[in-house]
Design a protein with these regions (language model features):
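N-terminal subdomain of lithium-sensitive/metallo-dependent phosphomonoesterases centered on the IMPase/IPPase/PAP
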Residues: 1-88
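DPxDG-like acidic metal-binding loop motif
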Residues: 77-116
Length: 116
């Protein structure tokens, strides 16, 4: 994986996660706009907005990578690398103002067998 410059990837991810976290924090105590509600899951408008921000930042920096996120996929499904994103990991907690949520971003490398 170091062929992509893992230190550079890590720096990009850190900055992106901090920016996404700032967006989430700015909306912490504001009314939440719910897009979808299920028994054990909730989808907020802010989930979509946060993933859009993350997608822009990561794919601007790494346009040949794919992105697989909780709110949808972008890029070539057969790319050598893909970002895996949960824009608000702990959305239910966040929706109810419980301070246990974060931005989760991982990077996967496609194996020789074609899986991640």
């Amino acid at each position: 994986m170091d062929g992509v410059g893992i230190a550079k990837c890590l720096d990009c991810v850190r900055k992106t996660a901090e920016e996404a976290g700032s967006l989430i924090y700015a909306n912490w105590r504001l009314p939440k706009i719910v897009n979808e509600l299920k028994q054990h899951d909730i989808k907020l408008k802010l989930d979509v907005e946060t993933q859009q921000l993350i997608t822009r930042r990561l794919l601007d920096a790494y346009p040949d990578f794919a992105l697989f996120g909780e709110e949808g996929q972008t890029g070539d499904a057969k790319a050598a690398y893909r970002w895996v994103v949960d824009p608000i990991d702990g959305t239910v907690n966040f929706a109810f103002d419980i301070p246990h949520a974060c931005v989760s971003i991982a990077l996967q490398e496609r194996t020789d067998s074609g899986s991640y």
